[in-house]
């Protein structure tokens, strides 16, 4: 059974950050903010995403001032429905009521 997940990341290295974003897109997750993705994952896909992110992170030895931090958070449909959205992108300014997520 699939569950909705939010995946947040704080990655200082541009190449690593771009690899993570491309990986998450390829796995079918939707980017909802610059460093946040969301999508439905069953347990098998979740393990696959987790393993892939670990592989990406382990490819580079980080310097002392660098960060590679990823947080994967499951959320229920009720929690998602109760979300509070503040703001919109420039293209949504005219259609604030049509914000999907």
UniProtKB/Swiss-Prot annotation:
GO molecular function: metal ion binding; RNA endonuclease activity
A GO BP annotation: defense response to virus
SUPFAM superfamilies for the chain: TTP0101/SSO1404-like
Activity across pH: Optimum pH is 8.5-9.0.
Keywords: Antiviral defense, Endonuclease, Hydrolase, Magnesium, Metal-binding, Nuclease
Family designation: Belongs to the CRISPR-associated endoribonuclease Cas2 protein family.
Function according to Swiss-Prot or TrEMBL: CRISPR (clustered regularly interspaced short palindromic repeat), is an adaptive immune system that provides protection against mobile genetic elements (viruses, transposable elements and conjugative plasmids). CRISPR clusters contain sequences complementary to antecedent mobile elements and target invading nucleic acids. CRISPR clusters are transcribed and processed into CRISPR RNA (crRNA). Involved in the integration of spacer DNA into the CRISPR cassette. Functions as a ssRNA-specific endoribonuclease, producing a 5'-phosphomonoester and a 3'-hydroxy.
Assembly and interaction partners: Forms a heterotetramer with a Cas1 homodimer. Homodimer.
UniProt name for this protein: CRISPR-associated endoribonuclease Cas2 1
Protein species of origin: Saccharolobus solfataricus (strain ATCC 35092 / DSM 1617 / JCM 11322 / P2) (Sulfolobus solfataricus)
């Amino acid at each position: 059974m699939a569950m909705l997940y939010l995946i947040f990341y704080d990655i200082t290295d541009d190449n690593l950050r771009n690899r993570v974003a491309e990986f998450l897109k390829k796995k079918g997750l939707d980017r909802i903010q610059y460093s946040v993705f969301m999508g439905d994952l069953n347990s098998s896909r979740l393990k696959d995403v987790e393993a892939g992110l670990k592989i990406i992170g382990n490819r580079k030895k980080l310097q002392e001032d660098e960060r590679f931090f990823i947080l994967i958070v499951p959320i229920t449909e009720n929690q998602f429905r109760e979300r509070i959205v503040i703001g919109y992108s420039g293209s949504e300014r005219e259609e604030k009521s049509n914000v999907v997520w």
